[in-house]
Amino acid sequence: KEDNTQVEVLPVNETVEEVAVVEKYFDRSRSAISLLGTFNVRDKDGNDITGAFTPRLKSLLILLVLYTEKSKQGILTKKATDILWSDKEEESARNNRNVTLRKLRILLEKVGDVEVVSDAGFLCIRWHEGVFCDYRMALDCIRQFKENGDHGDDKLLNQILEILLYGPLLSNTIVDWLDEFKDSYSSLSIDLLRNLLDVQRNNYDTVLRIADILFLHDPLNEEALAAKCSILFIQGKKGIAKSVYDRFCKEYKDSLGEEYKVPLCNLYK
């Protein structure tokens, strides 16, 4: 955790328009495995060792992290083998798996106190103090927030917004078996952010933050558009509201092949 307050620049539909001064709670600069946004791994000294992960090593690490968060047992060794080495005969697949596991364990030693555990036919990741994983932290923060109710404390709210600002789960990694995890995380994030738009509706600065982050997870989210344009209009920033709306309309047409039919004036109501 960083105790100092820093300036955070929030992306708004690909253009930076608002700058908020917020406290930073998380540090992905060392001893970190990052799955939100793009895949990244940092060692104990802060060196970026992402390049040391071959596609197979990367896939194995991601698989173990995701399945361990889904269930403490992790994933059946056979299932992991079937997913990652489906093109190999049984013996060859087993040998390849064991070699990859050894290499992964060596790399994780550089990251910090985190290990791959094989137990009772399952593989899982065991986390210890000092190693940060953004995906794991995001799920934990969201879980805490739901347990505390929609009006959770401001610190937890800001932690959630900070970590959701990292972006969707593994946005640049495209493999079939990831889809269910991506969809689940996306749905969880979007539902929470939409709810927060309503809960925080009288806190304009927070709503603007939430809308910006919601656009990261769902670029065509109409609730984020309406909330942002409405507040900018109230604040007298009609030109910025028009720019946000115009970019949304362009992205809407580029993505769906049709015009966005809700006029800007309707968003101010």
What are the functions of these language-model segments?
Residues K1-R56, S118-F122:
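Short boundary/linker motifs that mark transitions into or out of structured domains
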Residues D48-L84, L104:
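Short amphipathic alpha-helical recognition elements used for nucleic-acid or partner binding
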Residues R94, D150-L157, Y204-D205, K238:
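TPR-repeat structural position
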Residues G112-H151, S186-S189, L264-K269:
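A short linear beta-strand->loop->alpha-helix hinge motif most characteristic
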Residues M137, Q144, S189-L196, L214, ...:
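Structural register within alpha-helical repeat arrays
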Residues I142-L178, F248-Y252, L256-G257:
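Short acidic-capped amphipathic helix/loop micro-motif used as an active-site/signal-coupling element
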Residues S171-H217:
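Alpha-helical adaptor scaffolds
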